[in-house]
Amino acid sequence: MRQLLEASPVNDPFGYPVLYVDLRDERRALLFDLGDIGALPPRKLLRVSHVFVSHTHMDHFAGFDQFLRVVLGRKEGIVLLGGPGFVDQVEHKLRAYTWNVVHRYSV
């Protein structure tokens, strides 16, 4: 039997929660929560098509800024999904930046 996906926790059980799911045949991946993503190399982050955030406590959302830096400017869009109020919270994070050096990107 061929394995279609591989789910891997990014951190140890006591670290910030992040689950990376590689959809092998589709050449893309899913992220569940954005805690500490420092252990994921950029090549893996660039495969992510969807991010599912359970809630925006710091331990589940602290990696958002790092994720944004890696994927900003790529051609493919990314779907961010979260609970009630999530869109407003992401909007506030994006508005907190000064965007004068990224004028060529659509955010």
Regions found by a protein language model. Give the residues of each.
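Binuclear metal-dependent hydrolase catalytic cores
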Residues: M1-V107
